[in-house]
């Protein structure tokens, strides 16, 4: 017994002196920390939150402060504006309404908005609204449109620049009206449909359109491209197009639901899958219901090209996928978002069950956000089995 005890002591002493390799994830941690630190320094970003999921295992990284004034650190409860990532929630709401047979994406707006019958806007389909293929809207609803009556008049007087389904013009008005119509089909205002129905069903308890008073202390201060403090200003159709404020933890849960790593009710699962259907092709990119898809793995060059000025601000010819392409596993499903003072990026690959969220409280050029996101995606891919 004494001889065995002596052997064990010698063995564990030798083990303690040996150079045991660090956990594999520590190298990934260091790479993410290096990339985020360089990014924050280059663009003078006060705070960044990163979330990674690999086969259901979550990892969070918080850097910097949510406000230069208060010096409050970015943490698990920090709320960020996510800009156009909000559109993915609107797409999910519309898909959920379709699963519940409250609408069909093949329908025309006039079925739900009788005041649109007889106008060009009623000639497009709800699918056109959800895929940026209605015929050409400006990026934003004109600033002079403020009331519901003015919004109605705006869409009644709208005329397409090209036939529906032939070109993609990224814009807020179409997605915004898809959200309005989805809520109308559910017989409630959009805010109630989103915050009273969809978000609770998704289990997102820290995601808002209007941040409640009790949560304002966690609402990050955004900064514009000149470093001045700013938060989003509500405008026409702001709720369905850029209104969501959320945390890295809640947004990563949304990603995990999209990856089928977090179980939800069957109808909601079908709705989520419905947003992954491919309807149009633009170069390498497949346009789903708001979500954009690229072949996986996607190079930084591919990501940058898909987020270029040409793709975002110009009308580009698309090819309709007939029949629509069922949800694919080996693709990168992604969406960028920004407001005047915040930036966001979400991406996931169903085949390898990996996903990332990237949130920041400063306006940063798209290419900078994409470069950092690609590094994080590459690192997440290295974590996967």
UniProtKB/Swiss-Prot annotation:
Segments crossing the lipid bilayer: none
| UniProt signal peptide | 1-20
Report one GO cellular component.
outer membrane-bounded periplasmic space
Main subcellular localisation: periplasm
Q: What is its EC number?
A: 3.5.2.6
User: Is Transferase tagged as a keyword?
Assistant: no
First-tier enzyme category under EC: hydrolase
Q: Which residues does the record give as substrate binding sites?
A: 335-337
The UniProt keywords, alphabetically, are: Antibiotic resistance, Hydrolase, Periplasm, Signal
UniProt-listed GO biological process terms:
antibiotic catabolic process; response to antibiotic
Query: Which residues participate directly in catalysis?
Result: 84, 170
Family, per the entry? Belongs to the class-C beta-lactamase family.
Q: What does this protein do?
A: This protein is a serine beta-lactamase with a substrate specificity for cephalosporins.
Name-wise, this protein is Beta-lactamase
UniProt organism field: Lysobacter lactamgenus
